[in-house]
């Protein structure tokens, strides 16, 4: 397990959130962050993580949602795009790989 020092900027509300989380991976840490900060699920966030050696903050991911209509129903899908090109989708419990990307 690793300790992830997560820093998030809730873009539209201009709120800064910080949380240290122990997890096996960055995606697990971000999933835990969203479970503890449910108000962020409908937001737009820039997510930073503190580098272990230097202590500098590095932009690690961007979180946003898209709204679309499917069979006459309005739906929103929330995406996490990581700096290494990974695309994840929030399934209501955690982030999973987006099979459509």
What do these predicted ranges mean?
Residues 14, 29-31, 98:
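Residues in flexible loops and secondary-structure boundaries
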Residues 38-101:
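Short, mixed-charge low-complexity intrinsically disordered segments
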Residues 1-16:
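Short aromatic-glycine-(Arg/Gly/Cys) micro-motifs in beta-strand/loop hairpins
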Residues 24-43:
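A short, charged, amphipathic alpha-helix used as a generic interaction element across diverse proteins
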Residues 6, 26, 33, 76-77:
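Generic hydrophobic/packing signal
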Residues 14-25:
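A short, exposed loop/beta-hairpin motif centered on an aromatic-Gly-Thr core
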């Amino acid at each position: 397990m690793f300790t992830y020092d997560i820093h998030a900027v809730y873009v539209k509300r201009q709120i800064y959130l910080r949380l240290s989380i122990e997890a096996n991976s960055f995606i697990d840490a971000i999933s835990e962050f969203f479970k503890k900060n449910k108000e962020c699920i409908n937001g737009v966030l820039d997510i930073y993580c503190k580098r272990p050696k230097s202590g500098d903050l590095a932009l690690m991911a961007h979180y946003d949602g898209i709204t679309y209509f499917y069979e006459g129903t309005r739906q929103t899908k929330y995406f996490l795009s990581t700096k290494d090109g990974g695309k994840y989708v929030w399934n209501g419990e955690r982030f999973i790989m987006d099979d459509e990307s």
